[in-house]
């Protein structure tokens, strides 16, 4: 019997823009957090287990602020993203303190995922229920095999902008069959009077992005292979 899809949430980031654990900051008058909306939508879509990737340094605060509440409704497992969790033959360079990134975060969760199909998201982005329904459908209907049938939920860039500062997005290129061809990360995109523009030189110059541009917000689905 095939395993049910699990939800993996990358929550190791310290939220430096807000001076603390931004995934634990409420976003509405009722004390709900962005991560609460994601988990609720994922559960409604069919997910029954969530794996939180966190740092040891935030373990207690995370469990108290989020984990214990979620444990009432879903199976919960915690894994740590640590620098020394590396493939055989690799070592941490001397002086390295910065986390390796999202791929490494998933590597740290490999044992907890335990061969199940899984979706992975950021802890601090809002995705919407339809996105979780689509990725769950993909993970429960796609036949795994040598062709690696993985998936990403894409968004219209213009629907992911904010009037308050800038956003970082992965600008996607797809072929005529909606197969992902490439992603180019733009770390500073702003809404300038209804026109999305990005800069790579700290605002000295800006380049426009057209309507219809699709972006990644790090909602991926992977089959066991």
Please describe what each predicted stretch is.
Residues 30, 175-178, 224-225:
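Short loop segments at secondary-structure junctions
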Residues 129-218:
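Conserved core of the sugar-phosphate nucleotidyltransferase
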Residues 21-30:
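Active-site mouth loops of central-metabolism enzymes
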Residues 1-15, 29-122, 127-134, 140-141:
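Conserved N-terminal catalytic core of the sugar/cofactor nucleotidyltransferase
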